[in-house]
């Protein structure tokens, strides 16, 4: 009868759905990876927006300063991400992939400029309120941090442009040059990682010695490579122009390291004023 037919149909659909779930549940991760490859993710614009100071001033200056600190920390994280893109750019061989990554670095450079301006404007607004002398000194130090972090972004973009110029030429770096650049990039990334550890830590005493030690390593390595470059060019291990590109990268890393130390020193000053 009709009731029996309805019951059988319902039972069939229920069993069918249960079987589907039991079968497909084992392929969830595979399906996810397949869909992600077929449908490329859009670049997440929210990644590039300010996250902590978009709502304007808070009820007290101290809370506003705290929000600005969070934004500065996020700014520093994005700058390290930008540097790692540059590191990947050096070893990107496919022309289309290279152009996409270079464009992304350019985009990050523009974002860096905008973040510096917006955070600085916010801190300036905060400074116009009623503040203690200690809070005013904190803001001054934070403004310096923001300026130096933006300078790191400029250095990252300069590195990307040098890599792009080298790519447009007919020659390539030697194996030894690639190894030396990789070592310098690692030292630079270590400096950025140490900087992030310091700016994120709002409770402990800031020990800048490790940052200074890394900077000394970078300077010494730059000097060593600079001297060796003169010898290698004279011995015709590579031509003069490749030596120029090579040393531009090495020198820019050293300059980036200087900006990192400036951020660390500014943050130390902020912590001392706050203490």
Model regions: which residues?
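Cytosolic, long alpha-helical scaffolding segments
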Residues: 1-12, 16-275
């Amino acid at each position: 009868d009709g009731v029996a037919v309805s019951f059988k149909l319902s039972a069939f659909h229920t069993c069918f759905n249960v079987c589907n779930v039991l079968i497909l549940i084992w392929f969830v991760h595979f399906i996810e990876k397949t869909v992600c490859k077929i449908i490329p993710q859009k670049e997440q614009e929210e990644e590039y927006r300010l996250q902590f100071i978009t709502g304007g001033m808070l009820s007290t200056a101290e809370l506003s300063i705290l929000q600005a600190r969070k934004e500065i920390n996020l700014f520093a994280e994005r700058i390290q991400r930008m540097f790692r893109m540059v590191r990947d750019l050096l070893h990107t061989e496919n022309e289309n992939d290279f152009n996409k990554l270079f464009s992304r670095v350019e985009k990050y450079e523009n974002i860096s400029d905008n973040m510096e301006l917006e955070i600085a404007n916010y801190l300036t607004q905060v400074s116009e309120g009623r503040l203690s002398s200690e809070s005013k000194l904190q803001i001054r130090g934070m403004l310096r941090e923001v300026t130096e972090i933006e300078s790191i972004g400029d250095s990252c973009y300069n590195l990307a442009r040098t890599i792009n110029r080298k790519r447009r030429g007919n020659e390539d770096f030697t194996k030894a040059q690639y190894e030396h650049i990789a070592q310098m990039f690692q030292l630079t990334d270590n400096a950025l990682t140490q900087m992030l550890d310091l700016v994120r830590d709002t409770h402990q005493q800031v020990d800048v010695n490790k940052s200074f030690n890394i900077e000394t390593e970078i300077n010494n390595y730059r000097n060593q490579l600079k001297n060796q470059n003169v010898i290698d060019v004279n011995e015709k291990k590579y031509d003069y122009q490749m030596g120029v590109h090579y040393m531009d990268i090495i020198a820019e890393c050293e300059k980036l390291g200087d900006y990192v130390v400036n951020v660390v020193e500014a943050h130390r000053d902020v912590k001392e004023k706050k203490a």
